[in-house]
Each structure stands twice: as structure tokens, then as C-alpha cells.
């Protein structure tokens, strides 16, 4: 895997800032990711569960809906469905 010293330095700087879920580094990442992918509609989340909940909400999933999922999935994959009042 690719690694250079500047990555460790930046990681230490981010951790020392106390802003690991928000702040200038998240904004910088979002802007860089959007530019690299040619898409200005980028939303970052702090974890996969919140990303799934946001995607489900934006897809119109809500109370009373059924969402197909795998029975061999971890709890984090199904909890956003239940949080929205839908049935996994």
C-alpha cells in the first residue's frame, strides 16, 4: 500500500485538532473528492450506518415500507431501515 510520511503527519494533525467528524479537513476531503469525481453533489458521513440512513431517506423509505436485505448481514446494515420505521 502507498504511504509516505506526510500521511502520518496529517493524521496526527487531524487527531490533535479534535475535529475528526467535522471541520476543515472534512470540508477539504469533500471538495477534493467532488473535484476528482467531477461531481459537486458530495455528502460525507461519519460512518456507514448514517450513510445508509441518509440514502434510504433520500430514496423515500419510511414507516410501513419493506426493504429487502440479507439475513446474513450485520446489525449496522439493517438498523438504519428500522430507524426509519421500515421493516428489514
Residue ranges of model-derived segments:
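N-terminal "arm"/small-domain region of PLP-dependent enzymes with the aminotransferase-like
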Residues: 1-20, 24
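Phosphate-binding glycine-rich loop
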Residues: 19-66, 77-84
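Short beta-strand->loop structural element characteristic of the AMP-binding/adenylate-forming
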Residues: 70, 87-88
